[in-house]
């Protein structure tokens, strides 16, 4: 009997933790992820860590997508915001190469690495999660949803088709192909100003996407490696890629670099060079989104040929004849990456659409989407269009400045299709916003959020659109993620989580700045709190509005202050800035009004919090700091957990 019971437990465990074959040719899994790219791999790891079984369907043999299989071994942005699995990946790179400093080999990024190393790290991350089944050299060919279960047909490398049944499907493909397969409406190209209300959007919509790049990884062989002149070669196509005698009329005269700087731009550890050069280099225009497979293959062939012509130009015209395609990077016949670097995809019509306006003025929008953030970024709006014929008629979107920003959960959810989560670059953002949200650290966080959302939905037997926004955010925060893009409250700060949670309620708001390449949002934890700083308190606790009005109107005249349930909030409210006494009175009054605890109990909790977070509340006249107030509000009132929000960021009353 004991042996039989043990067998049952083992079988049950295999059902819960792994994709398993239900009948001949049919597998079952909690979640299927189409695409093992930059967001697909993080979605798989996060979902598995929450106990879900996952099947990842990846067309190549590599994991990591644009970071690895496309050759972009240079991470753009988020160096000071190592959120979640992006932070784990960066730490793994540092461990491999010896230090974070060892990653600073090229000037385009502070995190440079060989794509093959990144691929091994991603495979190791996935291999540690027993709930993940990885199907490489495989492709989703058809999907069907009956209202409860997805049926997914997958072409396998030996020519046969396997069928997987899953509760949730995640589209982590490079171009949003699964979303289209599921009938999700989407946009391609630039929306009009009328559609997005972005002042730098074009007046008329168009279907122009960003240039893609077929990256080349070169290494120095120490001898002449000049290739044969490629078919269709014309030196004029690349003459102004850098400062040289052939350049007469550059498209971008303000972006001309010496030839050595062009090469060291993408210098990698291991003495290799990433050739992903946007200035009349190997960027290539092809709108592959709605092409047939045959048309895509032809576009890829042309993009590869364009890159090889550029490599020949570097060898033959610029004197870099000892550089050639690395023979120890890709296991491909032509030594090129598995796929092009796509900067733009389909963008679904989601529950919400994230635009430039949400980035530049998150607190001034009709939808307070900042309350629903699941990923953060700090890269400027970066669009590549110089290889498009007629690009001079397009908006100038080259490094348009923005503060750091957060991406909302609702951008991952289609408006209509149930139990589908969309990740990678196909989330519901505007074309302009995609110039920032497309970068690798953000996309890794998108994947992690998608995995968390899917796993929670499975665990709770809910629709993905029924899962609490706050629950997803809390999982991400506990996994080392960021909800708010604060530059001045690092992840190792003792008050990181309280500031993140209170920031996500809007009780205390950040201040965005963009200076040169430094795009930040500042929480200002060590700044004293002005009364108007906490205007957001009334949005969470409407009855508190009268308390705040009294505080703003307070003078140096002694007053007993307004009362709540007959009890005075404060003996003498401070002028302009809150004192410690004001804060204690305010928080304890709200705790009583919300029936969380008596005021005396609240005072004891705040004394304990002050000790835990190492600040003093004995001097009631001292001006309280923003970080300290965040700790008190978070620890006593718990507004993040107790005041739920919908996908538009509105409080659920």
Question: Residue locations for each model-derived region?
Answer:
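N-terminal Rossmann-fold NAD(P) dinucleotide-binding loop
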Residues: 40
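Beta1/beta-strand and adjacent pyrophosphate-binding region of the FAD-binding site
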Residues: 26-37
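Boundary at the C-terminal end of the N-terminal hydrophobic targeting segment
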Residues: 19-24
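Flavin (FAD/FMN)-binding glycine-rich loop and adjacent Rossmann-like elements that form
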Residues: 155-168, 172-475
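Positively charged n-region of N-terminal signal peptides that target proteins for export
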Residues: 1-5
């Amino acid at each position: 009997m004991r042996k039989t019971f043990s067998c049952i437990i083992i079988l049950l465990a295999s059902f819960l933790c792994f994709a398993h074959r239900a009948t001949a040719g049919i597998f079952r899994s909690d979640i299927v992820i189409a695409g093992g790219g930059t967001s697909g791999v993080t979605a798989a790891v996060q979902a598995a860590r929450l106990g879900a079984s996952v099947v990842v369907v990846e067309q190549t043999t590599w994991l990591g997508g644009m970071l690895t299989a496309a050759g972009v071994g240079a991470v753009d942005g988020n160096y000071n915001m190592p959120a979640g699995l992006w932070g784990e990946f960066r730490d793994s790179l540092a461990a491999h190469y010896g230090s974070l400093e060892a990653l600073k080999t090229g000037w385009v990024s502070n995190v440079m690495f060989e794509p093959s190393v990144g691929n091994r790290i991603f495979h190791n991350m996935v291999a540690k999660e027993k709930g993940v089944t990885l199907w490489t050299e495989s492709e989703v060919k058809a999907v069907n949803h009956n209202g409860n279960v997805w049926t997914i047909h997958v072409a396998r490398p030996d020519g046969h088709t396997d069928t997987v049944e899953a509760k949730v499907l995640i589209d982590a493909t490079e171009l949003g192909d699964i979303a289209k397969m599921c009938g999700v409406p989407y946009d391609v190209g630039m929306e009009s100003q009328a559609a997005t209300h972005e002042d730098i959007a074009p007046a008329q919509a168009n279907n122009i996407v960003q240039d893609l790049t077929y990256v080349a990884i070169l290494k120095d062989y120490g001898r002449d490696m000049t290739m044969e002149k490629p078919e269709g070669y014309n030196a004029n196509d690349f003459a102004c890629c850098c400062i040289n005698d052939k350049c007469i009329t550059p498209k971008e005269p303000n972006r001309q670099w010496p030839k050595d700087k062009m090469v060291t731009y993408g210098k990698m550890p291991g003495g290799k060079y990433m050739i992903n050069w946007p200035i009349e280099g190997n960027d290539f225009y092809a709108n592959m989104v709605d092409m047939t497979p045959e048309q895509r293959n032809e576009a890829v062939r042309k993009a590869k040929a364009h890159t090889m012509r550029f490599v020949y130009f570097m060898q033959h015209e610029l004197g870099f004849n000892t550089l050639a395609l690395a023979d120890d990077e890709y296991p491909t016949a032509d030594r090129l990456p598995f796929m092009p670097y796509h900067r733009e995809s389909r963008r679904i019509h989601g529950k919400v659409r994230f635009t430039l306006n949400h980035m530049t003025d998150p607190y001034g929008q009709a939808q307070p989407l900042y309350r629903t953030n699941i990923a953060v970024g700090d890269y400027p709006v970066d669009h590549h269009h110089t290889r498009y014929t007629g690009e001079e008629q397009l908006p100038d979107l080259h490094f348009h400045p923005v503060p750091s920003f957060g991406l909302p959960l609702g951008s991952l959810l289609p408006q209509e299709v149930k139990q589908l989560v969309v990740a990678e670059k196909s989330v519901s953002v505007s074309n302009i916003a995609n110039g920032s949200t497309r970068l690798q650290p953000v996309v890794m966080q998108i994947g992690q959020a998608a995995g968390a959302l899917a796993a929670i939905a499975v665990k709770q037997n809910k629709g993905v659109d029924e899962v609490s926004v706050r629950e997803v955010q809390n999982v991400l925060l506990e996994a080392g993620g960021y909800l708010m893009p604060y530059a001045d409250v690092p992840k190792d700060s003792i008050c990181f989580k309280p500031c993140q949670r209170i920031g996500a309620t809007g009780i205390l708001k950040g201040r965005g700045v963009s200076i040169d390449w430094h795009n930040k949002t500042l929480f200002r934890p060590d700044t004293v709190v002005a009364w108007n700083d906490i205007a957001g308190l009334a949005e969470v606790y409407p009855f508190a509005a009268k308390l705040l009005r009294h505080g703003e109107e307070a003078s140096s005249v002694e007053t007993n202050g307004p009362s709540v349930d007959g009890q005075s909030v404060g003996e003498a409210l401070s002028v302009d800035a809150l004192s410690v006494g004001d804060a204690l009175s305010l928080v304890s009054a709200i705790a009583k009004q919300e029936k969380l605890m008596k005021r005396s109990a609240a005072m004891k909790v705040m004394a304990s919090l002050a000790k835990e977070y190492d600040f003093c509340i004995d001097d009631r006249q001292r001006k309280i700091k923003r970080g300290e107030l965040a700790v008190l509000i978070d620890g006593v009132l718990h507004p993040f957990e107790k005041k739920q929000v919908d996908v538009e960021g509105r409080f659920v009353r």
